[in-house]
């Protein structure tokens, strides 16, 4: 991130939830519990997949990669937010702000790319089951995970470089709880702010929409294949293998659409801050719950793993 323009401003101030002083302790406790649950839930999923040989398959390799991404995404944002809820000193250095934006966008886009890869995995499993082991080999799956991570890092670098090459002329208050693009654009000055804003918005929407359309295409083929299965039991079994992934996709893109496709007009900073909770705290919190409850195979394995750790003498 060399060449970033920080000659005018050396630090920013994260306003966060300062508009709700009487709620800050309650918000701290709530977000802390959700954060810990997110970490523990994803770590439990990873430990279960690692310890259960029956789960050593591409579907759960992608799930582990997704869990790692969610842990890193929340670590990039929530600890700083929790610290600010208990502090009156909310300044953040220029480079620290740039780093937070880079990591949050990188892991956020990696999450979207991995969901797309998981959609393709379900498509191959249901529409081409006889070719599954060939199309979803270990090498191929590792390559897809690596490409998802590389794509996320590139997106994070592109967005962060574009924003932090702008000039920030004196104003330092970011009306959000982390270094996000829209509130930072409001602090920027110069003739190129509008061009950068449109360019960054176009890149983000194109990437997210492209991932969503690919997932939609995968499920169009999946639904067509499921409808051809003669027995109701067979159709239910096929659909159950996709239920958890499909639910997470709906949650992920549902909240993303609220943020990126909201109508233009006057927006209160407090409203934008509260809306930011949906994709920084709520979505990562719900994801391990959905996967552990909607995926029967994973749920049974997680119960077995927990029972083994708690009562090893009975195993």
Curated annotation (Swiss-Prot):
Claim: Transmembrane helix is one of the keywords in the record: yes
Compartments reported by the entry: Cell membrane
Gene3D superfamilies membership: Rhodopsin 7-helix transmembrane proteins
GO molecular function: G protein-coupled receptor activity; olfactory receptor activity
Its membrane topology: Multi-pass membrane protein
PROSITE patterns: G_PROTEIN_RECEP_F1_2
Topology Cytoplasmic: residue spans: 47-54, 121-139, 219-238, 294-315
Residue pairs linked by disulfide bridges in the UniProt entry: 97-189
Main localization (coarse): membrane
Residues glycosylated per entry: 5
Functional description taken from the UniProt entry: Odorant receptor.
PANTHER family associated with the record: OLFACTORY RECEPTOR (PTHR26453)
Protein name per Swiss-Prot or TrEMBL: Olfactory receptor 10H5
Gene name for this UniProt entry: OR10H5
């Amino acid at each position: 991130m060399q060449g970033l323009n920080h000659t005018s401003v050396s630090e920013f101030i994260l306003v966060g939830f300062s508009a709700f002083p009487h709620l800050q302790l309650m918000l701290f406790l709530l977000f802390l519990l959700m954060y810990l649950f997110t970490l523990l839930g994803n770590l439990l999923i990873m430990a279960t997949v690692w310890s259960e040989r029956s789960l050593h398959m591409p579907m759960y390799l992608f799930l582990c990669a997704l869990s790692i991404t969610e842990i890193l995404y929340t670590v990039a944002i929530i600890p700083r937010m929790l610290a600010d809820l208990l502090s009156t000193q909310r300044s953040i250095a220029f480079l620290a702000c740039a780093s937070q934006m880079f990591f949050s966008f990188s892991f956020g886009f990696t999450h979207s790319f991995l969901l797309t890869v998981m959609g393709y995995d379900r498509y191959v499993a249901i529409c081409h089951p006889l070719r599954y082991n060939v199309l979803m080999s270990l090498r191929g799956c590792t390559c897809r995970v690596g490409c998802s991570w590389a794509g996320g890092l590139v997106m994070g670098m592109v967005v962060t470089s574009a924003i932090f090459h702008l000039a920030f002329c004196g104003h330092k208050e970011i009306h959000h709880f982390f270094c996000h693009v829209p509130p930072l654009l409001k602090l920027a000055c110069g003739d190129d702010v509008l061009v950068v804003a449109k360019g960054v918005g176009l890149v983000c929407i194109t990437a997210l929409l492209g991932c969503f359309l690919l997932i939609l295409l995968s499920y169009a083929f999946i639904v067509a294949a499921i409808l051809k299965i003669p027995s109701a039991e067979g159709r239910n079994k096929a659909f159950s293998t996709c239920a958890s992934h499909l639910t997470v996709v709906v949650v992920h893109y549902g909240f993303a659409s609220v943020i990126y496709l909201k109508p233009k007009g006057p927006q209160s900073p407090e409203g934008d801050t509260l809306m930011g909770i949906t994709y920084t705290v709520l979505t990562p919190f719900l994801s391990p719950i959905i996967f552990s409850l909607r995926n029967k195979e994973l749920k049974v394995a997680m119960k077995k793993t927990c029972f083994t750790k708690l009562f090893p003498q009975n195993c």
